[in-house]
């Protein structure tokens, strides 16, 4: 399911885009589908250093303190890296998304995710499996009006989907 979500998300990226990708596992899979794209990717996903080098895409790792639980890069260095760039499009994996907002399990990641959203001028996209839609995780990252798209599957909570559509979020379902 995650792979199909990532494949659908990659289809929204255009040549020469600057792309932010957070440390979420679904967002991480995007790297596979963008390897041959003519883009620049900035990520705080520590696992990205183990990916096969891309033939076209330029992958920049944010730096920062390693948050061992998620293999993500967090803290001032990570925040500073994203603060000094501006993206055309961003992709965030989340712990939950509901009427209460976007949330994550990891407190150190909330500030990085917020900066990713704030520094993106175009599409701000949540990529997540349906069971996380309608669910709140431990730490609030941002309100739902900060995002433009949600890519998920048909198991997503219908009430949350209706709410997101009512505030202008475009919802894309994968099979």
Residue locations for each model-derived region?
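HTH-adjacent hinge/linker in prokaryotic transcriptional regulators
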Residues: 1-25, 31-36, 52-57
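Conserved phosphate- and dinucleotide-binding cores of soluble alpha/beta proteins
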Residues: 42, 46-175
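Short, contiguous clusters of charged residues that form electrostatic/catalytic patches at enzyme active sites
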Residues: 3-7, 11, 28, 76, ...
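Short glycine/serine/threonine-rich phosphate/pyrophosphate-binding segments
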Residues: 27-30, 134-136
């Amino acid at each position: 399911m995650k792979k199909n979500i990532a494949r659908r998300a990659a289809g929204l990226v255009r040549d020469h885009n600057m792309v932010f990708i957070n440390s979420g596992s679904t967002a991480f899979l995007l790297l596979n589908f963008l390897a041959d794209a003519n883009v620049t990717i900035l990520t705080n996903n520590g696992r990205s250093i183990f990916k096969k080098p891309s033939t076209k895409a330029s992958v920049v790792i944010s730096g920062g303190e390693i948050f061992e639980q998620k293999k993500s890069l967090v803290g001032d260095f990570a925040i500073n890296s994203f603060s000094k760039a501006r993206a055309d499009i961003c992709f965030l994996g989340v712990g939950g998304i509901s009427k209460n907002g976007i949330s994550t399990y990891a407190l150190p990641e909330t500030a990085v995710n917020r900066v990713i959203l704030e520094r993106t001028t175009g599409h701000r996209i949540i990529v997540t499996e349906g069971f996380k839609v309608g669910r709140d995780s431990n730490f609030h990252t941002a309100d739902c009006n900060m995002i433009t798209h949600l890519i998920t599957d048909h198991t997503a909570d219908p009430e949350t989907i209706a709410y997101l559509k009512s505030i202008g979020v475009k919802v894309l379902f994968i099979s």
